[in-house]
């Protein structure tokens, strides 16, 4: 019974993702959410809610470790779906895309931290009247109980858009596997990935309407989209790369 319900949900999700506009317009959706959310935030049109606090459950247990969730779910899905369709060697090659994605995530987040450190100052409080010059990094300042003010590119906007787009690309094999050849483990992984994407998009929207300035969010979102584009649309189509997930023409 449970397997039948899962299979039915997978069929509906596959139909959704098969629509060309779903995958084509997802990057545009993130930009639109950032812009509209920022306008709403500046106009103070969105009331405070549970999600306006950074202590909400989704932020604490999902977004704060978002890359961990992405890797934990994508690793078995890529291995299983790519091996199921192609071969061991193809699956191993495709798994290197997770190493590349992790490198992109690490470089971008560390760069954001560095920029915030070199552009910021430590203050005794958020009134930013008394400066504490003995602290030259955000980490040291915050550890001492003070307030750091620097150019804070939105890491949430980056990681949530980037993770969603990477997952979108890696779920492509499910669009072309006939239902008769699927199995419960693969269906469950696919459902979990779709749930995670839904959470990422929702929390991306919450970030847009409750946190950061517009430039912080646009830069973070741009980095996420650029990281996805330069890998999946530029590098992975070339021979010496992790390659793309199995595409429609590869399924016979």
Swiss-Prot record:
Catalytic residues in the record: 156, 212
Tissue expression per record: Widely expressed.
Major subcellular site: endoplasmic reticulum
Membrane-protein topology: Multi-pass membrane protein
Pfam family, one: FIT
Any one cellular-component term (Gene Ontology): endoplasmic reticulum membrane
Positions on the Lumenal side per record topology: 47-59, 116-156, 212-223
HAMAP family found in the cross-reference section: FITM2
Family per record: Belongs to the FIT family. FIT2 subfamily.
Protein name, per record: Acyl-coenzyme A diphosphatase FITM2
Source organism (scientific name): Danio rerio
